[in-house]
Amino acid sequence: MSKSENLYSAARELIPGGVNSPVRAFTGVGGTPLFIEKADGAYLYDVDGKAYIDYVGSWGPMVLGHNHPAIRNAVIEAAERGLSFGAPTEMEVKMAELVTNLVPTMDMVRMVNSGTEATMSAIRLARGFTGRDKIIKFEGCYHGHADCLLVKAGSGALTLGQPNSPGVPADFAKHTLTCTYNDLASVRAAFEQYPQEIACIIVEPVAGNMNCVPPLPEFLPGLRALCDEFGALLIIDEVMTGFRVALAGAQDYYGVVPDLTCLGKIIGGGMPVGAFGGRRDVMDALAPTGPVYQAGTLSGNPIAMAAGFACLNEVAQPGIHETLDELTTRLAEGLLEAAEEANIPLVVNHVGGMFGIFFTDAESVTCYQDVMACDVERFKRFFHLMLEEGVYLAPSAFEAGFMSVAHSMDDINNTIDAARRVFAKL
């Protein structure tokens, strides 16, 4: 047995499923998950000594690559002054100033410890600010594991949501309306059925949890218009897209102004950080200045703030996003060319430093139904063959891939060459 197999066997006796987040268990592709020893730049190194070109990037945060010296040094320096104080620090102020400067729609920001905390708190704030209970989310979009968000669509277009996890009371789920991503008609229908009851829409501007599905040109502006028409708030969940699709996020890339924004992943530079913020009048409703409660023992933790501050300063340097786009575009084009040579039907979506690989005969993938029609079994074979080639992709057909500026053009070309060999075997 390999060392990864031995560790996984031991882990399953001690940790549910052997992992601390379900997708890591390789249940979406089968087999034994890799246990990682270290990472540097664009590469992961497993406990058995094998290196992989990494397109998971810790599920998004590693836009600069692994073990970036500016972030590592910032963490070391901060740790020498203490790990946590439970009191305000200067770095919290500097971090808030940096974030609000980089994302102009955020007049104020509150730091938390995860993307789930950010979305959960933003929804509570929207409900408290509007005095309404219902929310709209989209089928196939993921916003963390808060009870109100673990909800799937009912049996009809306008039925109330149903829990998609045991432990979520139906009474919670009934306040969550699930609409179709990239379909404004389904959203209007929900508002027309509940015109005075919907507090907010929460949306991934690029749906990254049904692989990578960009918005149609009219979709995000249409959501903004519907929120204005019916008095609801628009929450854009940029946990995945923030500072990756563009410096000011996908909202800037697509030209839409939200009321609230949720951030995570890159904002922590690899440390556990989330944030939410937006309009000053809405944020003023948050405790201690307002009645909507939110708190956190480790929120604004000095180590995490130092890592995030260092990361964002690096990400804000000229040329970063142009490089991300160039690398991702080359990868997407190369994969499509290699698939065509092997007569493999393939769609590759990409925006900025995100991409998605779909084995499908369709010309495009624009919604959850399109994603579900893809050939998952072929993806599983593709994943394992690429792993044998030393390329680490997300171990699920429903998760986006992530580029970093640490990837070289040689890494990209080697990945395309590996895919060409793999396509010949599919």
Curated annotation (Swiss-Prot):
Compartments it resides in: Cytoplasm
Gene Ontology BP term (one): protoporphyrinogen IX biosynthetic process
Catalytic activity as recorded in UniProt: (S)-4-amino-5-oxopentanoate = 5-aminolevulinate
Pathway per the UniProt entry: Porphyrin-containing compound metabolism; protoporphyrin-IX biosynthesis; 5-aminolevulinate from L-glutamyl-tRNA(Glu): step 2/2
Domain of life: Bacteria
Residues recorded with modification N6-(pyridoxal phosphate)lysine: K265
Gene3D superfamilies referenced in this protein's UniProt entry, alphabetically: Aspartate Aminotransferase, domain 1 (3.90.1150.10), Type I PLP-dependent aspartate aminotransferase-like (Major domain) (3.40.640.10)
The enzyme's E.C. designation: 5.4.3.8
Molecular function terms from GO: glutamate-1-semialdehyde 2,1-aminomutase activity; pyridoxal phosphate binding; transaminase activity
Keywords, in A-Z order: Cytoplasm, Isomerase, Porphyrin biosynthesis, Pyridoxal phosphate
Protein's UniProt keywords contain Cytoplasm: yes
Any single Gene Ontology cellular-component annotation: cytoplasm
Cofactors, names only: pyridoxal 5'-phosphate
Keyword rRNA-binding: no
Protein family according to the UniProt entry: Belongs to the class-III pyridoxal-phosphate-dependent aminotransferase family. HemL subfamily.
NCBIfam families tied to this protein: hemL, PRK00062.1
UniProt subunit comment: Homodimer.
Protein name per UniProt: Glutamate-1-semialdehyde 2,1-aminomutase
Source taxonomy: Bacteria, Pseudomonadati, Pseudomonadota, Gammaproteobacteria, Enterobacterales
Gene from which this protein is expressed: hemL
